[in-house]
């Protein structure tokens, strides 16, 4: 998908979502806290079931990850990445399969061709990367949380992946469950590209220090029961203004259980361009 195609997708998606909000508002779920229940409870249950399913039956996957995150107040252009991710697996409380990550940056032009590999428990916990173009002269080993690896990033590479996204969603929702002031709505019939989804929208109309966002939307693929898009906004800067986009992640062309091997996370793989 080209940058222009992505822009058209976002615009058409925004229009269709607005229509969806109008049409389904009366049928959506929007509840306030009562007794020991909370409006987030159904969303937490959906996320937990999704995580359990992934941990049980998804070994690995490939996708085109499109992301944009605000860093130091600046919102950059979308980054497009071809990713291979092997999920972490345990057996009898012991690590059986370490998480593995391979990323090849596709866009924008200034990062096109950059490759990054990280494997849990290997290379002293460091990622191994190389730059693109004429700067591709050496491999570098970097602390995932260090300055160089975090430059232009909101989260470390070790936080990537659908299971980590689900863990973040569950953790955030569990914390917010301690407070009033949350509205939750569910919309069927949403789409991400050609994938049919159910969208869960969480809104905090009144800004409070214990809330990290104004509105967040999670799109669960109806076939896979996995979140393939997450987007959040902070509160409008002026009364009656538009919410401020904070971060968005979309997993396009997702393929599950593609039998990735250790070779897929080896910088010496001849299919890669490591020097």
Question: What kind of feature is each model-predicted range?
Answer:
Residues 70-72, 109, 117, 123-275:
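Gly/Pro-enriched, hydrophobic low-complexity segments
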Residues 40, 87, 95-103, 213-216, ...:
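Glycine-rich, flexible loop segments associated with nucleotide phosphate handling
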Residues 30-37:
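Boundary at the C-terminal end of the N-terminal hydrophobic targeting segment
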Residues 7-10, 22-23, 31:
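Short hydrophobic transmembrane-like helices used for membrane targeting/insertion
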Residues 16-28:
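Bacterial N-terminal signal peptides
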Residues 14-18, 51-58, 90-97, 190-196, ...:
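Short, surface-exposed loop and linker segments with low hydrophobicity and enrichment for Pro/Ser/Thr
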């Amino acid at each position: 998908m080209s940058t222009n195609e992505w822009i058209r997708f976002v615009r058409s998606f925004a229009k269709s979502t607005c229509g969806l909000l109008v049409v389904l508002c009366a049928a959506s779920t929007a509840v306030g806290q009562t007794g020991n229940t909370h409006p987030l409870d159904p969303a937490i249950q959906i996320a937990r079931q999704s995580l359990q399913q992934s941990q049980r039956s998804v070994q690995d996957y490939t996708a085109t990850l499109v992301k944009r995150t605000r860093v130091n107040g600046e919102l950059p252009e979308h980054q497009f990445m071809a990713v291979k991710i092997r999920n972490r697996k345990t057996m009898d409380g012991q690590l059986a399969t370490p998480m593995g990550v391979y990323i090849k940056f596709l866009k924008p032009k200034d990062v096109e061709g950059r490759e990054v590999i990280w494997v849990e428990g290997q290379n002293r916990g460091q990622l191994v990367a190389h730059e693109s173009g004429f700067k591709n002269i050496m491999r570098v080993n970097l602390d995932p949380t260090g300055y160089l690896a975090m430059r232009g990033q909101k989260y470390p590479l070790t936080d990537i992946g659908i299971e980590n996204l689900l863990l973040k969603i569950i953790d955030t929702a569990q914390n917010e469950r301690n407070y009033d002031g949350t509205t939750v709505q569910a919309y069927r019939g949403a789409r991400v590209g050609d994938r049919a989804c159910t969208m869960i929208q969480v809104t905090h109309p009144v800004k409070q220090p214990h809330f990290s966002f104004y509105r967040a939307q999670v799109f669960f693929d109806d076939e896979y029961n996995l979140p393939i898009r997450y987007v959040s906004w902070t509160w409008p800067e002026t009364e009656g203004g538009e919410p401020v986009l904070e971060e968005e992640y979309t997993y396009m062309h997702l393929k599950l259980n593609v039998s990735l091997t250790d070779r897929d996370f080896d910088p010496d793989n001849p299919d890669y361009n490591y020097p």
